[in-house]
């Protein structure tokens, strides 16, 4: 890994530390000034820092580690229209309903997005869902979203980037090739077209009663875990 890449990773660690250091204070201020729920503020803040870290990692891999032209890469989260399946329409027994849908077929679509859509030369190559943490009930929806996206973009690389893991197994060990957990792998087995790469940044299974925004439960963001994420992303982007 290039020295410049290492420097960028250490900047991300400083950013993470700074955000976590003031999160409790900012949450209390939000409750006082805006009458906002503490839990909602903290969840949103953790989600935002995860999204920011993820986007910075993608750009660091492309711009710094791979030395590619930054203008070739773009990231957004605009909704993508998933069209209705013609085979579904053909299978409808109600002829009136089938006729109605067929005559309005262009109106039938579902707008779908994940947190980060990564494009190279305007080609959608990476989809990344960002979570402060993930449990298996949440994973089901993530897999459904990617399943639908893969019907339109079959070569899409799919990622879940999470600060903490609540999936069980060894996801919380932050290894590159986790074995996973029994329930997680079982759920994933029903979405065979989705090869979901799960990247965890903070060690240790998430505990509801040990929130990392509390100083006594703080978890450090380590450079070696960011390096694992860098490796995943570089491998995928090198295939482009």
Swiss-Prot record:
Signal peptide boundaries: none
Broadest EC class assigned to this enzyme: hydrolase
EC numbers: 3.1.21.4
Gene Ontology biological process: DNA restriction-modification system
Keywords: Endonuclease, Hydrolase, Nuclease, Restriction system
Keyword Hydrolase: yes
A GO term, aspect molecular function: type II site-specific deoxyribonuclease activity
Reaction(s) the record says it catalyses: Endonucleolytic cleavage of DNA to give specific double-stranded fragments with terminal 5'-phosphates
Protein name: Type II restriction enzyme DdeI
